[in-house]
């Protein structure tokens, strides 16, 4: 993913790599990207996280994945607080079936799904922010 001369170049690259974030205005991309890069000694910018973060999960054997999933479900089932589950409908990680299961067990999450958004909703659309605020604060008139 390399280095970038400036924040605009980094934001453009992240936008190309992160189409699953959904529709995000340019000024928001710049703000998001400012938290995703770090400056190198020569002044160039580089990513502040490992873009290959998911590789170990993809490399798991089926048995290891099933064991890990059982542990995660066991922990999820113990949650006592209200849970808001936000799912971008284009997510390649959180399936519709898993999201629905999360509404039926454990804390019985309240599910919000947004079309045109992938696994990492940015919560920058006013209607998305309003829905989250309604969950956290109660409906505001």
Across the structure, where does each feature detected by a protein language model lie?
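Conserved beta-strand segments of alpha/beta enzyme cores
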Residues: 108-110
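Generic structural signal for secondary-structure transition and capping sites
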Residues: 19, 81-84, 141
């Amino acid at each position: 993913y390399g280095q970038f001369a400036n924040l605009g170049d980094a934001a453009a690259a992240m936008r190309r790599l992160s189409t699953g974030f959904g529709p995000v205005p340019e000024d928001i991309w710049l703000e998001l990207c400012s938290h995703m890069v770090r400056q190198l000694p020569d002044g160039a910018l580089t990513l502040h996280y490992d873009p290959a973060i998911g590789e170990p999960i993809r490399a798991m054997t089926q048995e290891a994945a099933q064991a890990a999933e059982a542990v995660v479900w066991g922990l999820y089932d113990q949650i006592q607080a209200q849970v808001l589950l936000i799912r971008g409908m284009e997510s390649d990680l959180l399936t519709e079936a898993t999201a629905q299961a999360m509404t039926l067990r454990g804390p019985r999450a309240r599910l919000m799904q947004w079309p045109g958004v992938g696994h990492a909703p940015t919560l920058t659309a006013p209607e998305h922010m309003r829905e989250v605020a309604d969950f956290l604060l109660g409906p505001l008139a």
